[in-house]
UniProtKB/Swiss-Prot annotation:
Belongs to the GcvT family. Keywords: Aminotransferase, Transferase. The keyword Cell membrane does not apply. Its EC number is 2.1.2.10. It comes from the Bacteria. The lineage of its organism: Bacteria, Pseudomonadati, Pseudomonadota, Gammaproteobacteria, Alteromonadales. GO terms for molecular function: aminomethyltransferase activity; transaminase activity. It is an enzyme of class 2 (transferase). The glycine cleavage system catalyzes the degradation of glycine. This is Aminomethyltransferase. It catalyses: N(6)-[(R)-S(8)-aminomethyldihydrolipoyl]-L-lysyl-[protein] + (6S)-5,6,7,8-tetrahydrofolate = N(6)-[(R)-dihydrolipoyl]-L-lysyl-[protein] + (6R)-5,10-methylene-5,6,7,8-tetrahydrofolate + NH4(+). It comes from Shewanella loihica (strain ATCC BAA-1088 / PV-4). PANTHER family: AMINOMETHYLTRANSFERASE, AMINOMETHYLTRANSFERASE, MITOCHONDRIAL.
């Protein structure tokens, strides 16, 4: 039996097309994936992300433990509510998961992990926490709703209490605050402004309905994928996994090499990979007809005249730009043009940094 989120009946009420997503019954779309995509870029849409797992890490050694566990450094987080993104690596520097960590106090951090990696993540964290004065608590009683788009914050404000609106006023990106029963964070997976709201399951249906009543449109996994790809955001299991190091997944910016004496898990292996050189994740743009798809081979000739090959990790038609975009892992020697093999023909593509759309506009 597939797992169902607390909002399952709300999806059925809205005539969602449900699909299995890593063991969860989730909405693919509510009619038109393209319309859902545009509503997030132009107005406000919401996603049920209750399949993701909230984990609270508490105790006297919570900071020390997370500085060991994560490649990014939680010691950088000084202001309560501030969050950072980064990888949890294995000893070979493979990415076990990418996750967001919120600093709530010196003895309380909150991690949000991907649904596809939940069991693996929790097993790894439980193993690594041995010997630390730390308690790891999964919070299955919490649901999560992401409200995203240029009008998302204004429409959410109509639903929040006065206290909650005061709490989020002026909040910068990548912060979270507990106000009343809601944990409201300025994070997302779309490249738009908005909130990810963690809500007790008992209140989730009422919050979803209140957002609906205020003109926020429900959006499914289909639009979520095209939006995150336009924003150049990785999808775990597709753009990276344990066989991929973070430098080859456009996550180099999330690795805190300083201070040198912080021995995070995977550091030694990653330093060796960095010294030897590794592949990189790039963006591809194809203005010709056709759609770039996962797995298609990518070819280019390097500066020495040698043909090199990589592969697309995520590809789609971009509803915002009107042509196809992709992310691809390729040898580091790639220039600004390449070719993709589709239907036994090679088609030219532009190579850019993997970010295509930000705040509704072309980002390259």
């Amino acid at each position: 039996m597939a797992n169902k989120t607390v909002l399952f009946n709300k999806h059925l009420e809205a005539n969602a097309k449900m699909v299995d997503f890593h063991g969860w019954d989730m909405p693919l779309n509510y009619g038109s994936q393209i319309e859902e995509h545009h509503v997030v870029r132009q107005d406000a849409g919401m996603f049920d992300v209750s399949h993701m797992t909230v984990v609270d890490v508490t105790g006297a050694e919570a900071c020390d433990f997370l500085r060991k566990l994560l490649a990014n450094d939680v010691a950088k987080l000084k202001v309560p509510g501030k969050a950072l993104y980064g990888g949890m690596l294995d000893h070979n520097a493979g990415v076990i998961d990418d996750l967001i960590t919120y600093y709530l106090s010196d003895t309380h951090y909150r991690i949000v992990v991907n649904s596809a990696t939940r069991e693996k993540d929790l097993a790894w964290i439980t193993e690594q926490v041995k010997g630390y004065d730390v308690t790891v608590t999964e919070r299955p009683e919490l649901a999560m709703i992401a409200v995203q788009g240029p009008n998302a914050k204004a429409k959410a404000a109509a639903v929040f209490t006065d206290e909650q609106n005061a709490a989020v006023e002026g909040m910068k990106p990548f912060f979270g605050v507990q106000s009343g029963s809601l944990f409201i964070a300025t994070t997302g997976y779309t490249g738009e402004a908005g909130y990810e709201i963690i809500v007790p399951e008992a209140e989730a249906e009422a919050l979803w309905q209140a957002l609906l009543d205020n003109g926020v449109k429900p959006c499914g996994l289909g639009a979520r994928d095209t939006l995150r790809l336009e924003a150049g955001m990785n999808l775990y299991g597709q753009d990276m996994d344990e066989s991929v190091n973070p430098l080859a997944a456009n996550m180099g910016w999330t690795i805190a090499w300083e201070p040198e004496d912080r021995d995070f898990i995977g550091r030694e292996a990653l330093a060796a990979i960095k010294a030897a050189g590794t592949d990189k994740l790039v963006g591809l743009v194809m203005e010709a007809k056709g759609v770039l798809r996962t797995g298609m081979p990518v070819f280019f000739t390097d500066a020495d005249g040698v043909e090199q090959q990589g592969a697309i990790t995520s590809g789609t038609f971009s509803p915002t730009l009107g042509y196809s975009i992709a992310m691809a892992r390729v040898p580091n020697s790639v220039g600004d043009v390449a070719e993709v093999e589709m239907r036994k023909k090679r088609v030219p593509v532009k190579v850019i940094a993997p970010s295509f759309v930000r705040n509704g506009k072309q980002a390259f």
